[in-house]
Amino acid sequence: MSLPAPLHPSVVHFPIALLATGSAIALVYLLGWRRPALPVIAWAMIFLGWLALFAAILSGLVDRNRAPDDAAVLAVLNPHIAAGFGLLIVYGLLLYERLRNPGVLEARQRRWYLLALLVAGLALVLFEGWSGGRLVYDLGVGVQR
């Protein structure tokens, strides 16, 4: 059995979908739509997305060796890599808050901090998707022509 080459495109969709949806659900809950199941769903999706992020980053770093060392590619690729590690940090902080206090979404004193982390996480997810799309569709990285 051999792994597909490149592997990164096969795994990258999971953290994007899980982190974006989990963040959106947590934001909806924080902003007032209080349904008992929402925190459970949000934290589960964020945790699974964070785990999937490790696979996406690892496969991306391996596949990076196949990318051309072109200045235009590196101008998009380097921020793309940095944002991936930023996602690990932002969502790691969110999960740490959840670990410290399982009811953190109910804590009024942490609301602005959580909102900031969730919005920053969503912004990074959007940037990751956009920059990854630029690498593939605009610059042809990983595409045989």
PLM features: what roles do these ranges have?
Residues M1-R145:
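Polytopic transmembrane helical bundles with strong interfacial aromatic enrichment
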